[in-house]
Amino acid sequence: MSENVELRRAHILANHILRSPRPSSNPSLTPEVCFQYSPPELNESYGFEVKEMRKLLDGHNLEERDWLYGLMMQSNLFNPKQRGGQIFVSPDYNQTMEQQRQISMKRIFYLLEKGVFQGWLTETGPEAELKKFALYEVCGIYDYSLSAKLGVHFLLWGNAVKFFGTKRHHEKWLKDTEDYVVKGCFAMTELGHGTNVRGIETVTTYDPTTEEFVINTPCESAQKYWIGEAANHANHAIVISQLSMNGTNQGIHVFIAQIRDHDGNTCPNVRIADCGHKIGLNGVDNGRIWFDNLRIPRENLLNSVADVLADGKYVSSIKDPDQRFGAFLAPLTSGRVTIASSAIYSAKLGLAVAIRYSLSRRAFSVAANGPEVLLLDYPSHQRRLLPLLAKTYAMSFAVNDLKMIYVKRTPETNKAIHVVSSGFKAVLTWHNMRTLQECREAVGGQGLKTENRVGHLKGEYDVQTTFEGDNNVLMQLVSKALFAEYVSCKKRNKPFKGLGLEHMNSPRPVLPTQLTSSTLRCSQFQKSVFCLRERDLLERFTSEVAELQGRGESREFLFLLNHQLSEDLSKAFTEKAILQTVLDAEAKLPPGSVKDVLGLVRSMYALISLEEDPSLLRYGHLSRDNVGDVRKEVSKLCGELRPHALALVASFGIPDAFLSPIAFNWVEANAWSSL
């Protein structure tokens, strides 16, 4: 280094040390004021009565819901933490898998002590079932691991005993299950078979000399897999197994097997292993079970559908094996109902957090030296959240309608419940996952923190798209049911009745060529276009299958060939069913602000569903100009729903403590003083 360079550096350093700073050229300059949190409630007014909207959305048992929210907020078991000047309750996801499992069980016993589960199995009737649904939904808002464990114990194990069993089983098991003396699990899924229940490989035989059934896992693919509660806590299992009688396979049957003693030791001839860590739901102890010729009493066959007498004679009032299989699966519909319902409450939670955050968080300014703009005032942000909000509203009405049909079910409605619950379960759980992803992105990096809930919920709820039936398979089930109904009515020359197909008895709707704003928002137009879409796809699907069937191919193979048309049809059926529930709810309301806002929500649901489905354009029912009109109207509706955004999420009725810090004063929650 040259001497001149060294001298120059020394001179610069001396100036830094010895000289005073130059006076500012702008002596009046003051530091900019830091960002201040402003609660959305200060700037956003409610344009309708929130309590009335909540009654519509929750549908039933509001007092019981609020009672349970309060119970959870009162106990340290629910991990209360102060953030940003208020208390939040949510699970601690920093706990190990084993800690999460144990705390979930402690929470269950706390709720048991408080009487939350009273009557869940021993009381009957629509009111008792609706109360159970309501309390179950609240548990899921706190933690899906908690509600999943309850679902396994009450809705799978408990309902199996209740609906597959008879008096002898009810007297022995139901009260002890309700009191958690017996802890149950539901062993249906296997390593090699899940949605295809018919293919289950576990085999049960009967020994008439001892009057015992013998359950066996014949190969590794037959091990029971993903069995909730099996890894740690369950002491009894419902075992779904093939029943082999004297070399004849009688198909799927349902048995009770003890897998642990009351001290928690694994029973002889049973092996249990842990499924391990998961992407979510680590408070649920999923396990694997092998049966090595496990012997159980003859009375442990749940015999409402079929029985084996002491001498080994097989008896059933249902002679047809396919009908008998259907009878075994029918009681499982409640699982799809609760999954659909919990998916919507999860979407509500994500939207409440994301929309509240977008009403206080600002970014960029649209004018020189202007104030930064609220996120939800950007049309792009409205477009990403408000259509999902409208869909969540529509699906809330749909799932409430499904629950009412389910609790008032009759043998005549069982088929419709099975079909509708399959479609709703698939569409609503897909909607939930899409909503949570959009909400995670909409809150930026804050969505990565588990305390803010939105991002973590994705891992918790992802399982819903595949358990209790893979969504794609369920959608195929819907289209097959519609196909069978269509063919049956045409063959018998009878009018359509049931599954919402009555509109096909009327002339084919004719859509206007010009779609004005008032036309697009007209409920009759919306219903007509949804009916036309379903009708056209059903006719196309049946025509395609019938044409190819005439060439000698099997119907099942042809369903597979036409899977895309099949999925379009089942989506059209389900979305039309959802729209109808909103129309029904709207029709019951008196004129007023609640009805007006619900009309906007309904129009948004209808039009965004049309915008996202290319089948109407593909088959020529809407022109390219029509599709452009729909797109523009969705954007207009975003602007009209924007002033109601806070009130719409407030109507979810979720207490502040169950949301997250970024839904409130996120500046204070992240301040140094809050550490």
Curated annotation (Swiss-Prot):
- Protein name (database record): Putative acyl-coenzyme A oxidase 3.2, peroxisomal
- Which segments of the protein form a coiled coil according to its record? none
| Transit peptide, residue positions per record | 1-34
The cofactor(s) it depends on are: FAD
Pfam families, A to Z: ACOX (PF01756), ACOX_C_alpha1 (PF22924), Acyl-CoA_dh_M (PF02770)
Where mainly located? other
Q: Which reaction does it catalyse?
A: a 2,3-saturated acyl-CoA + O2 = a (2E)-enoyl-CoA + H2O2
Q: Where in or outside the cell is it found?
A: Peroxisome
Q: Which gene encodes it?
A: ACX3.2
The record, for PANTHER family, names: ACYL-COENZYME A OXIDASE 3.2, PEROXISOMAL-RELATED, ELECTRON TRANSPORT OXIDOREDUCTASE
**Any single GO CC term annotated in Swiss-Prot or TrEMBL for this entry:** peroxisome
What organism, scientifically named, is this protein from? Arabidopsis thaliana
